[in-house]
């Protein structure tokens, strides 16, 4: 059959674009779909149903395939049938066979539903959506094995009443609230063949109940007004919107269709189960329903008292890991009390799941062991990032390149004295000067010491007893003193607990320096002898801990430390073993301040320069010549203040900068220190709201000499340039000059 190049135009084909609704055929006619072109499907393909009809004159009720075949036989071109005729006949367009089916639906877990129904089933609704329990599960039978079905469910209001739970029963409380938007849940496996549906239990466990009206999940379909089941617009999604304190009835539907978009024009078979009726609540009202949920729902662990939730399981795993770590370290390091006491405290900060709870107690380890008050997300994140959380919570820090987890050599063990300072003797304002703290033992670049010499003297016998004391007395707030370790060899770390830097009970688990910023670059610590005065006061290890580098202040040699200490009139050993308040004096005499609050430099260098200039006259006074004979005389001059009060500065804020050339000229071998001080004008803010009961980090010039009034007059009399020069030359001053400067 040959077709002409130009197809003739048949009058009446334009009628195909006008809406025309014929009488409904027994199966279903799709002419309305082709004529209306609904908004949800602007380019609807020809339907697979064989009952679809085009709006050609005289062929309104003919199936589309019959029209195409008849047109080919009569010689009518395909283009004359309208634009839809150009569409290729797909397999889904073929008419389905007429199948007789009789679906039957059986509710799963009917006995459990009956138990809930007798007591009045309650379902919790939340903003984010809550799944149903018992879940809605059915088993289907009687379906055609080859035909495709769509299975879905919706929840409708059982009545027009609002309820309240009163006197252990539900009673009507008024008229129902306005109905929520209609929402249906289509099973995610739809469409599927009848054989697939009948081979398994159909569960709607992913359906969620919510009271969030603004929920936008899903899509919307428009149902015709003459639909047997639904009319109007319905949205399809995973969440159904309900009103609290209203009674609802779930419904189950079976639709024989192979496309979800055909739902508005398909026949629904609806099934109701009265035992699935429930009342939507925001919190369980009936205790019997709550108990039923606990007894039957394996996920209802928020109400349990037996401790089967995730938090309880984490605690059990933590206790189990404690025993495993104890046994492992006993095998590696022997069964002696000494090795076990060393390992117990190291494991406390080695891993988040280590014997932290059994060693120190949960009162001081809230950052390491998840408590009941924590949320699951926080506890899980701490478990997932165990090493990072461990390192951030460490109070004992090192500058070694070697990992802190190396458990092989006992010399690399960082010991935490958890209960070294009980509360009765831990107050700084009540203890005597000689019994307040043991001298701080700080070792810097001590390569010649052996493992036994580097061990702290307090470690041998007191740690187990103190740990037991802290465990037996949970009311006591144990302090966690700072342990500063440095060594340039990065192989064996010296041990030096610094009790004067102990944190308060609330800060026991926090990081070194308590989060205060320190605007010092590690490159400023890389110059040898730059901070020799700090090393003289025992500050070399502290700066090395701040820099975090293995080549920083730990590179300070012994000669620089010894020479600076000799200039102060102290030996190298006494400079490192001074009590903490005397170390503050030595630091302040060099223009530096060491704050017990956790910050190193709590005010700018200009303030420190002024303080050092004022105290340079007393740098070699009798206080420094006899450091241990004047303890009682010096103690009343120490100021107790929770705030950092800056030392008064003479006029001219650029005091250090203007005098820099003269300082560089007169510095000589000390120009490295001057340049380092001038090049890094750091200003660190101290937490003024801190409740630490310790002395202020600011030491005025009057606390450096025996006569504060004379020193104040001396400071006012001297000029700024002379003060700076005296700072530089004070270390090399002769004894007779220092005697004339002191009263």
Curated annotation (Swiss-Prot):
Residues 324-334, 379-388, 418-437 have a biased composition (Basic and acidic residues). Gene3D superfamilies: Transcription factor, T-box. The modification Phosphoserine is found at residues 371, 432, 438, 456, 707, 738, 740, 742. Residues 438-447 have a biased composition (Polar residues). GO terms for molecular function: DNA-binding transcription activator activity, RNA polymerase II-specific; DNA-binding transcription factor activity, RNA polymerase II-specific; DNA-binding transcription repressor activity, RNA polymerase II-specific; RNA polymerase II cis-regulatory region sequence-specific DNA binding; RNA polymerase II-specific DNA-binding transcription factor binding; sequence-specific DNA binding; sequence-specific double-stranded DNA binding. It is found in: Nucleus. Keywords: Developmental protein, Disease variant, DNA-binding, Nucleus, Phosphoprotein, Repressor, Transcription, Transcription regulation. GO terms for biological process: animal organ morphogenesis; anterior/posterior axis specification, embryo; atrioventricular bundle cell differentiation; atrioventricular canal development; atrioventricular canal morphogenesis; blood vessel development; branching involved in mammary gland duct morphogenesis; cardiac epithelial to mesenchymal transition. Residues 107-220, 241-305 bind DNA. Residues 544-695 are annotated as: Transcription repression. Disulfide bonds: none annotated. InterPro entries: p53-like_TF_DNA-bd_sf (IPR008967), T-box_DNA-bd (IPR046360), T-box_sf (IPR036960), TBX2/3_TAD (IPR022582), TBX2_3_RD (IPR048387), TF_T-box (IPR001699), TF_T-box_CS (IPR018186). Widely expressed. GO terms for cellular component: chromatin; cilium; nucleoplasm; nucleus. Residues 301-342, 358-465, 688-707 are annotated as: Disordered. Interacts with PML (isoform PML-4). It is linked to Ulnar-mammary syndrome: Characterized by ulnar ray defects, obesity, hypogenitalism, delayed puberty, hypoplasia of nipples and apocrine glands. PANTHER family: T-BOX PROTEIN-RELATED, T-BOX TRANSCRIPTION FACTOR TBX3. Transcriptional repressor involved in developmental processes. Binds to the palindromic T site 5'-TTCACACCTAGGTGTGAA-3' DNA sequence, or a half-site, which are present in the regulatory region of several genes. Probably plays a role in limb pattern formation. Required for mammary placode induction, and maintenance of the mammary buds during development. Involved in branching morphogenesis in both developing lungs and adult mammary glands, via negative modulation of target genes; acting redundantly with TBX2. This is T-box transcription factor TBX3. The lineage of its organism: Eukaryota, Metazoa, Chordata, Craniata, Vertebrata. The gene is TBX3.
């Amino acid at each position: 059959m040959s077709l002409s190049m130009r197809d003739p135009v048949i009058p009446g084909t334009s009628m195909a674009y006008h809406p025309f609704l014929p009488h409904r055929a027994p199966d279903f006619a799709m002419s309305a779909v082709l004529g209306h072109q609904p908004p949800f499907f602007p380019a609807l393909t020809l339907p697979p149903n064989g009952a679809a009809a085009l709006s050609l004159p005289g062929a309104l009720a003919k199936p589309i395939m019959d029209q195409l075949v008849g047109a080919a036989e009569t010689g009518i071109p395909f283009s004359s049938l309208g634009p839809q005729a150009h569409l290729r006949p797909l397999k889904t367009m073929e008419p389905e066979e007429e199948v007789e089916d009789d679906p039957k639906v059986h509710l799963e877990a009917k006995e459990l539903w009956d138990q809930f129904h007798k007591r009045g089933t309650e379902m919790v609704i939340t903003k984010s959506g809550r799944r149903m329990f018992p879940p809605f599960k059915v088993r289907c039978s009687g379906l055609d094995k080859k035909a495709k079905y769509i299975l879905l469910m919706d929840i409708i209001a059982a009545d027009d009443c609002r309820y309240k739970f009163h006197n252990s029963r539900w009673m009507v409380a008024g008229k129902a609230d306005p109905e929520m938007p209609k929402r249906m849940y289509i099973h995610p496996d739809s469409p599927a063949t009848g054989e697939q549906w009948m081979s398994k239990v159909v569960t709607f466990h992913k359906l969620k109940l919510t009271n969030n009206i603004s929920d936008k999940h899903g899509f919307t379909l428009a149902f015709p007004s003459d639909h047997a089941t639904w009319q109007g617009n319905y949205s399809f999604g995973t969440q159904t919107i309900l009103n609290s304190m209203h009674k609802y009835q779930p419904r189950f539907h079976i639709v024989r269709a192979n496309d979800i978009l055909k739902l508005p024009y398909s026949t629904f078979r609806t099934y109701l189960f009265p035992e699935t009726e429930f009342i939507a609540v925001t919190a369980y009202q009936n205790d019997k329903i709550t108990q039923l949920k606990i007894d039957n729902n394996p996920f209802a662990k928020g109400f349990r008292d037996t401790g089967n939730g995730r938090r309880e399981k984490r605690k059990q795993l933590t206790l189990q890991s404690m025993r495993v770590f104890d046994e492992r370290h006993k095998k590696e390091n022997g069964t002696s009390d000494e090795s076990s006491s060393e390992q117990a405290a190291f494991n406390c900060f080695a891993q988040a799941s280590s014997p932290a709870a059994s060693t120190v107690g949960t009162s001081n380890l809230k950052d390491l062991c998840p408590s009941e008050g924590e949320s699951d997300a926080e506890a899980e994140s701490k478990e997932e990032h165990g090493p990072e959380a461990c390192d951030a919570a460490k109070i004992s820090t090192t500058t070694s390149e070697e990992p802190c987890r190396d458990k092989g050599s006992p010399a690399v063990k960082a010991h935490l004295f958890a209960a070294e300072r009980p509360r009765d003797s831990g107050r700084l304002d009540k203890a005597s000067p000689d019994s307040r703290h043991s001298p701080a033992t700080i070792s810097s670049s001590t390569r010649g010491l052996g493992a036994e010499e580097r061990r702290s003297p307090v470690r041998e016998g007191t740690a187990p007893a103190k740990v037991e004391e802290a465990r037996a007395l949970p009311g006591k707030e144990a302090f966690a003193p700072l342990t500063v370790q440095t060594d340039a060899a990065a192989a064996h770390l010296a041990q030096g607990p610094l009790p004067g830097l102990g944190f308060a009970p609330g800060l026991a688990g926090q990081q070194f320096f308590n989060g205060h910023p320190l605007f010092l670059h590690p490159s400023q610590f890389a110059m040898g002898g730059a901070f020799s005065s700090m090393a003289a006061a025992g500050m070399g290890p502290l700066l090395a801990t701040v820099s975090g580098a293995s080549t920083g202040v730990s590179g300070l040699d012994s000669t620089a430390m010894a020479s600076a200490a000799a200039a102060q009139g102290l030996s190298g050993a006494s400079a490192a073993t001074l009590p903490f308040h005397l170390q503050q004096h030595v630091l302040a005499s060099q223009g530096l301040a060491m704050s017990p609050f956790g910050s190193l430099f709590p005010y700018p260098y200009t303030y420190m320069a002024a303080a050092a200039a004022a105290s340079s006259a007393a740098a070699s006074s009798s206080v420094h010549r006899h450091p241990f004979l004047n303890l009682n005389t010096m103690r009343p001059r120490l100021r107790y203040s929770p705030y950092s009060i800056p030392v008064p500065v003479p006029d001219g804020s650029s005091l250090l900068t203007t005098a820099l050339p003269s300082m560089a000229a007169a510095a000589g071998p000390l120009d490295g220190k001057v340049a380092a001080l001038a090049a890094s004008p750091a200003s660190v803010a101290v937490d003024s709201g801190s409740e630490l009961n310790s002395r202020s980090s600011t030491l005025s010039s009057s606390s450096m000499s025996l006569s504060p009034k004379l020193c104040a007059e001396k400071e006012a009399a001297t000029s700024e340039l002379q003060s700076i020069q005296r700072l530089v030359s004070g270390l090399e001053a002769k004894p007779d000059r220092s005697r004339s400067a002191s009263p």
